[in-house]
């Protein structure tokens, strides 16, 4: 939360926290206030599960394994692979043909990302890719995938990477 809040939150909009366990509430509020986010209007009791159980409408992102991603690449499917890792991670190796935009820069680089074509989000293990995918969905991208395990799983599967 302390690292990612600045990438996705706005100081001029109310914040509703979604926490699986209320014991994390005080710490989350403290982190946000220290970062200058003080318009915290409440929290969702019961977390996401409570939201589901109440019958409210939800959205979700699709998940891909690295094997499914590799199959899409091999079939030549139209797909943007968006790697949102840091520059040093990218330089150590990435999927050939992937586009690199650091997760914190995605909101300001939306014009570089096709909203009407599939995008597979990729990072080191999937956490930042999930955040990046959420940003893309919020910004109107229609078909967004979070690649489970991302680079860690890609390497474990023995799939090729490049440093070019």
Put a short name on every predicted segment.
Residues 1-80, 84-164:
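Rhodanese-like catalytic fold shared by cysteine-dependent sulfurtransferases
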């Amino acid at each position: 939360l302390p690292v990612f809040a600045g990438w996705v939150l706005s100081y001029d909009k109310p914040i509703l926290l979604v926490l699986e366990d209320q014991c994390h509430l005080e710490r989350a509020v403290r982190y946000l206030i220290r970062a200058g986010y003080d318009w915290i209007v409440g929290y969702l009791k019961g977390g996401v599960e409570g939201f589901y159980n109440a019958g409210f409408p939800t959205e979700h992102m699709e998940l891909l394994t690295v094997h499914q991603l590799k199959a899409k690449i091999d079939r030549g499917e139209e797909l943007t692979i968006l790697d949102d890792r840091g520059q040093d991670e990218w330089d150590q190796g990435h999927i050939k043909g992937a586009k690199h935009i650091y997760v914190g820069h995605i909101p300001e680089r939306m014009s570089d990302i096709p909203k009407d074509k599939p995008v597979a989000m990729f990072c080191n293990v999937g956490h930042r890719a999930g955040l990046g995918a959420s940003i893309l969905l919020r910004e109107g991208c229609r078909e967004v995938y979070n690649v489970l395990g991302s680079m860690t799983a890609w390497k474990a599967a023995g799939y090729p990477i490049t440093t070019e």
